[in-house]
Amino acid sequence: MEETFTEITPQQAWEMMQNEDAVLVDIRDMVRFSHSRPQGAFHLTNHSYGKFLDEYDYDEPVIVSCYHGVSSRNTAQYLVEQGFERVYSVKGGFEGWVRSELPIELGY
């Protein structure tokens, strides 16, 4: 059976960040990430992937968020294939995060 990721709600993602030291990676473009993002998010891009590998271990929970919860699935699956053991994708992405009224950071 192929290992895969798990889809979770924005609220579940926030709880994992608080209780399990999960890292939330935001894969949206730089302009949107710079404007507003989930509180504590790491901006994961092709350029920041090396830094991400330096800062986080393969056994740490990783939560992937995008715009609407679609492209995060591909990134989540990629991270599983790279050896990350606990990978999650946020249903509804950043849009769902905002609708759930979870903490965000604004500005640069």
Curated annotation (Swiss-Prot):
Q: Name one GO molecular function term.
A: thiosulfate-cyanide sulfurtransferase activity
InterPro entries this protein is in?
A: GlpE_sulfurtransferase, Rhodanese-like_dom, Rhodanese-like_dom_sf, Thiosulf_sulfurTrfase
A biological process term (GO) from this entry: glycerol metabolic process
User: Which residues constitute the catalytic centre?
Assistant: 66
Upper lineage ranks? Bacteria, Pseudomonadati, Pseudomonadota, Gammaproteobacteria, Pasteurellales
What does it catalyze? thiosulfate + hydrogen cyanide = thiocyanate + sulfite + 2 H(+); thiosulfate + [thioredoxin]-dithiol = [thioredoxin]-disulfide + hydrogen sulfide + sulfite + 2 H(+)
Its GO CC terms are: cytoplasm
Matching HAMAP family: Thiosulf_sulfurtr
- Localization in the cell: Cytoplasm
UniProt-listed CDD domains: GlpE_ST (cd01444)
What's the protein name?
Thiosulfate sulfurtransferase GlpE
The record's annotation in PANTHER family points to:
FAD-DEPENDENT OXIDOREDUCTASE, THIOSULFATE SULFURTRANSFERASE GLPE
Q: Which UniProt keywords apply?
A: Cytoplasm, Transferase
Major localisation: cytoplasm
Q: List the NCBIfam families.
A: PRK00162.1
What task does this protein carry out? Transferase that catalyzes the transfer of sulfur from thiosulfate to thiophilic acceptors such as cyanide or dithiols. May function in a CysM-independent thiosulfate assimilation pathway by catalyzing the conversion of thiosulfate to sulfite, which can then be used for L-cysteine biosynthesis.
All residue ranges annotated as the Rhodanese domain in the record: 18-106
The kind of enzyme this is, by top-level EC class, is transferase
Q: What is its EC number?
A: 2.8.1.1
PROSITE patterns membership: RHODANESE_3 (PS50206)
Similarity comment = Belongs to the GlpE family.
